[in-house]
């Protein structure tokens, strides 16, 4: 790994994302190269609360939650990259929140079920006027299960 590539454990992830159980959908960052890409993991367990109703007897992770997991990983990459771009320290703003603001070309290729390990791969396409665009892929056992282009933006002090 080069100096700008690092892994993050759950405690560091919590510093960058406001999400908490049951909506924190990233368990580990295996690689982040600021300004380029991020790789993350979500361990999908039978204990996830959304499996209680989706579907009884045939548990399937909701596709929108796979998208949300990708957006959370993109949020971390965007915050880290944006701060570096501005010459700021690599620390999240205490009251800054990164918002998921758009999605294009979303495709769901296969279901995600308990026991799967979701591998997320997010790459920056561009940033313009505070809006970041990313390509996002989710894989299970090397098989593509979801892909999309997502957009995020940050809200600093005061939530704007």
What are these regions (language model features)?
Residues 3-7, 75-119, 145, 153:
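Hydrophobic beta-strand-centered segment that forms part of the acyl-chain substrate-binding groove
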Residues 14, 57-58, 108-110:
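Beta-strand-rich interaction surfaces with strong enrichment in secreted/lumenal proteins
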């Amino acid at each position: 790994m080069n100096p700008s590539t690092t892994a993050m454990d759950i405690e560091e992830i919590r510093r960058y994302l406001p999400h908490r159980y049951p909506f924190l959908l990233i368990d580990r960052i295996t690689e982040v190269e600021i300004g380029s890409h991020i790789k993350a993991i979500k361990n999908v367990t039978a204990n996830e609360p959304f499996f209680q109703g989706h579907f009884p007897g045939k548990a399937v992770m909701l596709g929108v939650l796979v998208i949300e997991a990708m957006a959370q990983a993109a949020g971390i990459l965007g915050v880290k990259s944006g701060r570096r771009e501005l010459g700021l320290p690599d620390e999240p703003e205490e009251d800054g929140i990164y918002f998921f603001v758009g999605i294009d070309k979303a495709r769901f290729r296969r279901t995600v079920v308990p026991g799967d390990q979701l591998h997320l791969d997010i790459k920056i396409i561009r940033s313009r006027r505070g809006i970041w665009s990313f390509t996002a892929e989710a894989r299970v056992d090397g098989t593509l299960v979801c892909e999309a282009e997502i957009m995020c933006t940050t809200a600093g002090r005061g939530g704007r």
